[in-house]
Amino acid sequence: MARFRGSITKVSRRLGIALAPKAEKYLERRPFPPGQHGQGRKGKISEYALQLREKQKMKYLYGILEKQFRNYYKKAVAQRGVTGDNLVKLLERRLDNIVFRAGFSPSRAGARQLVSHGHVTVNGKKVDIPSYLVSPADVMEFRQKSKNMSAVTDSLNKTPESRIPAWIQVDKAHQKAVFLSVPERADIQEEFNEQLVVELYSK
């Protein structure tokens, strides 16, 4: 699948949110949009622009292009419950997101590579599809030949226990994680407003 290959730091500055760890320091130094007039941009933002910005935040955060993101929205609409909540929960269930949340990679992009390169198994079977939707009680583990990779070990060592969400149980020694349950929206601390995205697609 095609992926965004531009400057993630420029996009982060434009959207006002760190989309990757390396973008955090740039936002601290330059917390304004890129470009010659980035610091001086003022004026009221239209409702459509706000909705579009929130959609872009979600797409870039989870590393998803428009067609797939719209498909997630359609699935969210078809499910019972609040559409916005359903959308976020679907994105959180992606295998690459779980690998990231468990601390096996410092970024979702890195987690996506680990999955697509065939390093990860789900319930004992190799899964190389980053968008694979994990279900409660599923066990994610690195293949035997992939265990103890320096990138994974370093990430686990640098990931504090407080960063690992309550809905994922991680066994660092065996590089294994169990998806305990689908999180509630209130438990997902991300800087976007999915309701604006729902309003955008509902037009």
UniProtKB/Swiss-Prot annotation:
Q: Which residues form the S4 RNA-binding domain?
A: 93-153
Q: Which InterPro entries match?
A: Ribosomal_uS4, Ribosomal_uS4_bac-type, Ribosomal_uS4_CS, Ribosomal_uS4_N, S4_RNA-bd, S4_RNA-bd_sf
Enumerate the UniProt keywords alphabetically: Ribonucleoprotein, Ribosomal protein, RNA-binding, rRNA-binding
The record's PROSITE patterns line, in alphabetical order, gives: RIBOSOMAL_S4, S4
Q: Which CDD domains match?
A: S4 (cd00165)
* Example of a GO cellular component annotation carried by this entry: small ribosomal subunit
Q: Which domain of life is it from?
A: Bacteria
One GO term of the biological process aspect: ribosomal small subunit biogenesis
Molecular function GO terms recorded: rRNA binding; structural constituent of ribosome
Listed HAMAP family: Ribosomal_uS4_B
Q: Which family does it belong to?
A: Belongs to the universal ribosomal protein uS4 family.
Chain's role = One of the primary rRNA binding proteins, it binds directly to 16S rRNA where it nucleates assembly of the body of the 30S subunit.
What binding partners and quaternary form does the record give? Part of the 30S ribosomal subunit. Contacts protein S5. The interaction surface between S4 and S5 is involved in control of translational fidelity.
Report what the protein is called. Small ribosomal subunit protein uS4
Q: What is the lineage of its organism?
A: Bacteria, Pseudomonadati, Chlorobiota, Chlorobiia, Chlorobiales
